[in-house]
Regions:
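Ubiquitin-like/PB1-type beta-grasp interaction modules and other compact soluble beta-rich domains
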Residues: 2-141
Length: 141
């Protein structure tokens, strides 16, 4: 329930009023380096990328920046009316209800990996953070 409320608030703040997603002095903010790691649990493929995001910016912005600057990275998303921006596919691979697969969002900071509690439209990566996009299943193994 709390996750739904947080996501709804982020969605409401971002879409109608794009300026609310950034601080008032965002013109003075610098670009900070971040990493994006794409992991496919089924093929054991791991791809690593470097990009930047505006300080206090969003994961969505970092992924767009990476897509704009790398021929090897593509992502797609949908906008859910209740839950906001939803990561749909990475490099042409999409989650599937039939196959019980999805893209799990993780963060690695100082060697500690945690699951994100918000989506790409709300999460604010920090300098030198590794954002992990993990293609996995919710089915019991």
């Amino acid at each position: 329930m709390a996750l739904t409320a947080i996501t709804l608030l982020c969605f409401a703040a971002l879409l109608p009023f794009p300026g609310l997603a950034l601080p008032a002095d965002s013109g003075k903010l610098e670009q900070v380096p971040v990493k994006v790691t794409v992991i496919n649990d089924f093929t054991n493929e791991v791809l690593s990328y470097s990009t930047t995001v505006i300080e206090e910016g969003l994961m969505f912005g970092a992924l767009n920046q990476l897509q704009d600057t790398s021929n090897d990275f593509k992502f797609s998303y949908t906008i859910h009316k209740t839950f906001g921006i939803y990561l749909e596919s990475v490099n042409g691979l999409a989650g599937s209800d039939k196959d019980q697969t999805y893209w799990e969002l993780l963060s690695e900071k100082a060697g500690v990996i945690t699951r994100l509690e918000v989506g790409i439209g709300c999460y604010q990566p920090q300098r030198d953070e590794n954002m992990i996009l993990r293609f996995t299943t919710w089915a019991k193994k």
